[in-house]
Curated annotation (Swiss-Prot):
HAMAP family: SfsA. Pfam families: SfsA, SfsA_N. This is Sugar fermentation stimulation protein homolog. It comes from Klebsiella pneumoniae subsp. pneumoniae (strain ATCC 700721 / MGH 78578). CDD domains: SfsA-like_bacterial. Belongs to the SfsA family. GO terms for molecular function: DNA binding.
Amino acid sequence: MQFDPPLQPAILLKRYKRFLADVVTPDGRELTLHCPNTGAMTGCAAPGDTVWYSTSDNAKRKYAHTWELTETQQGAVICVNTLRANSLAKEAISAGIIPELSGYNQLKSEVKYGEENSRIDIMLQADDRQNCYIEVKSVTLAEKEYGYFPDAVTTRGQKHLRELMAVAANGDRAVILFAVLHSAIDRFSPAHHIDARYAQLLTEAQDKGVEILAWKAELSTTRMTLNKPIAVVLNPGK
């Protein structure tokens, strides 16, 4: 995925109302950015961090600028735009980068499925194999070398795990793909300390045939690529 035109830098003043952030540009202008992230954004939004933003030419948008990346004062680069995770996953799958998800000739998005009124992020299909249902999650919470999901209690995420378990029980492939969008993360774990129920369900899902993958993105202000598998540790410390 390329940013064209390249992203522009600014210094974060504050994030507020979840969807807005005030920044100051190198030439001293103050801008309000759209923040496409409803999570806690722990460690991703400290005042004084450098943010990188894109600009839309859509005149109907109230806020023309979108917060894409954070460059923390500790040197980490983080993609805070959670909408990018699905696009990165689709690109990586289509390019054959993720071997576990290769061999399919059709890729569909936002397909209705399940018993809880859900839509799957990605469905892969081929004539010679069962359908593959893929739920994509964006990982930006870092503690030491670990990346954690979720960064807040997520009943929606719990629902998705229940739906994936039902898919696996019916004989199709069920995959949860954690897209790691933080340069300092080298392994993934569910956030037991934030949402114990989600962590419990993820372990249960694996036991019932749901495949768990974690892939890390290479991030820059000009392009992003999901290209590196990292270890999944369901119960760190045990």
